Amino acid sequence: MTAILGLNLNHPDASAALILDGKVVAAVAEERFGQRIKHDPSFPQHAIRSVLSIGGISARELDFVAVARDASRNRAAKISYVLRHPFGGGKAALEHMHRANVDLGIGEQVALACGQSPDSIKAQLVNVEHHLSHIASSYYCSPFEGVTAGFSYDGSGDFTSAMAARCEGTRIEVLDRVHLPDSLGFFYTACCQFIGFDEYGEEYKVMGLAPYGNDSFAEVMRDLVETTSDNWFKLAKGYFGMHRGGESGKMDERNRVEMLRLYTDKWSAKLGSPRQRGQELTQRDKDIARSCQVRFEDVALHCFKRLHDLVPSERIVYAGGCALNGVMNARLLRDTPFKQAYLQPASSDDGLCIGAGLWTWHNVAGGRERFHMSHAYWGPSYSDDVTRRTAETAKMPMRELPHGMIPRAVASLLRAGLVTGWYQGRSEWGPRALGNRSILADPTRANMKELINEKIKRRESFRPFAPSIVREAVSTYFEQDVFSPFMMHVVKIRPEWRERLPSITHVDGTGRLQSIERDTNPLYYELIKCFGQLSGIPIVLNTSFNENEPIVDTPDQAMSCFLRTGLDALCLGRHLLVKPEHAALLDAACSDQAEPSAIAVDA
């Protein structure tokens, strides 16, 4: 057996994955454990212990430790940058050298995290370039074997912001790179910062805000990021912090990612004064968000069409933080020559650990067997005994049900208007709640979006909620029949259904859909089918099970969220609880049911 530990560490979204004989057996992000800080950039000690425990091996049995960073890459680009920016560029170079030195002690850190002596770890350390790890994370998890285009784009990693590749069989051939200071990801982040969304990882909020605006600043955005026929893209000099040299962010004393300002004072001459965090959003801010999103899509389409010129295939795999832009993902399938696309569920930096690990399997260990990731459930799970003990501590009205009765009982509560926490099986891999750590509700109720935003999630009112739908019904309700198991595509809801689905229809008539197959999550699939029988529409509102924190991972965390928020009900494994005022609804939901359906559930 070949055992590989893949790591993204000392970098935002620190994570770990365990790969045994070329197959992913576990993958988790550090933010779900320990301090539970979103985008936790610290050494992923808890994640390492978790994946090794799930895989049933010790650190001593590891053959390789694959790290998604290679500070030795792109030296010519770094030297050129230092020469143009002697002070700031020198600081950036020193930071990259420091990271290389940190990598020398990773084996010892893994040993300490697992409570073992440093000399007991015999694994070979393998460094894999950041964007190569991104592409590997999607290609080596995809079902594609023939010639496939590969792409990665984000803010930066190993002094690169984008990479193009040709993939075939077990080989990934890098064709081109975009080096700093040019970065489409930093362009988007700079726009986010300018309108007051200045914390790390808030780009998704601006994507949700954009449909409320008009493309009033199209000319400004074209000036900020340019494309030509003979290159990918370039940022306008003097308008971005990276052109001054140095890093784009740092870690504070509490292990939180602190972003440095990416826009310069020159923006104000074109856009006015920047919005401060907490100030009321104006129409100008919404228009900036809209123009930013439109320009991002235009530049991304330019890149994907150029990629197709380099790799004329109908298949594409891609990753990186920018790959979480669901509006762009749907456009790629509509407006480029690519007809088949694959993204794995953790397309941002948390997914780097899988890419580094699988690249090592194929290119260092010599593995030939490919792996296909068809579901996202790679985290920990907890036994019925654990969920029962947790449920009993609440002292709330509760029923313990066989698996076959759970879907209809929960569907009945949803149809009665109860907002329900749904906690089942192994936790999801990636930033999306995909049917195992979800908050569910009836999408046909007009007040549901406002209720959840105000009483449970306590977040901005403009942010949309996602629909989960059985795969075979997608074309009935959505204009684009896209298979989106990992909630990666924002598509138009058919006009005739928008008024009937008010809580999952965004202001522009779209929804970020998740299409569910019976084989990948039979319990969740059956729940949606049961809700469809009661409501006439096989769709549920799905949002992440959390309240301004990382998604819940343990039964205790799920119970805490249930008790302290406005959640009405909680399905914790086979244990269905409600707040006292809903006891009668619980009794009704659990009585007079038909024979339990046969559902194969991986406990």
Give, region by region, the residue ranges found by the protein language model.
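Extreme N-terminal starter segment of soluble prokaryotic enzymes
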Residues: 1-5
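Flexible beta->alpha loop and helix N-cap segments adjacent to enzyme active/binding sites
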Residues: 8-29, 34-38, 81, 88-92, ...
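N-terminal phosphate-binding loop and adjacent alpha-helix
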Residues: 32-57, 300
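Short HxH-centered metal-ligating active-site micro-motif
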Residues: 43-54, 65-69, 527, 535-537
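Short beta-strand-loop/turn "lid" adjacent to the catalytic site in phosphate-handling enzymes
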Residues: 58-109, 136-137
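Adenine-nucleotide phosphate-binding core of ATP-dependent small-molecule kinases
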Residues: 277-303
